[in-house]
């Protein structure tokens, strides 16, 4: 959607996620708690704020494994084997869904076997995932590089779709590729030296990821045949190249051995990511249960310390994700928006906790937080807005479903698990989500129907009542109002100090949350 200007999309995404990563780095090193992305809003905004952050984190975690499985099957379909797992429109066939279920079951089984199996499997996959992209960059830059592709006038120039194309590319795959820095936060409570390790892991992972993907994009654009982009950038690789673009380019360049490695990588890399997130989603289910948000059965572990019920539950939900969102492209937009909403909870949490817990040692402090924290919140809302009304609508269906389950459970939960919700501290959350949805509905994204992969064939277009560029100003002003609102209604100091101890020890949160009410911080 951006042409050669996609390089700017990668730089912009790296900068935005980089600042968000720095926000998480301070929070993670200051509050090294397992499942940190769900815990920070709990500390800053009470039980309802904690559920909101935890639910968004769970949505993105439980959908990533299915996305990675479908990506692997889609790549496999583009090989000479043609196993019949994917329809021509990108959706899975019946046999494809069956194979996807087996893959998800394997991820679940490895996680059930415990941390040692998971760590060994993930270490191997991680080495592979770094080596193959690096090799691809080097080979393509040496073997085939057409510098004219970066300014091909016949294809519309450097930015054939203008600024709108650059922005729209972020939620279509760019941000999705760079996500994942929060994994160091999720396991922060298990690090040997969290105050020293967490912020370094977050920052280094973002720098390496951004550099690799930016160079991959340079190699990709440079390897394209100038004749194929003469008609435009809509389909720069004719035929089935869109299913395995780098492998197709390697084949065309005469390096078939690299294409073979890339097809193997198309299975190993998604499998490694899916394996990690199968465990992450179960960890978050466990955390939501331990926090009193979900039934206690999901918060139980077996003799190996594995949350067996949560793993099975997440496998079932992962399979359901294939049904309404069968297309890889359709799922990427959804999970990107969910992930960025999860990230967006961090800047207000940082502001709230700096005000209500100012004396706590902070091994890493975000520089110029007065500027970077609100800026990161604005930029996170930009990415969600660029995902488009179609994506936001379906994401909000998931969010509403989660709140319905939460409130129903709270209504029937035994007295010992009922939570004081701290409505005042979380008062900014409903206006934030509703307002962002309204702006998206009236805004500029999307302006054309996606080709496939949306639930039940429904594609919802934005009304475009707010002009382009004006819409970004509206999002920015709205975001700043919400940010400073959130900072003013933080939970009081006494609550935060006790909550850190209770969360760290996984004690009875219901007892804690009944004791405090939100109070504005002077």
Where are the regions that the model predicts?
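Hydrophobic alpha-helical segments and their helix-loop junctions in multi-pass secondary transporters
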Residues: 79, 111, 127-157, 217-226, ...
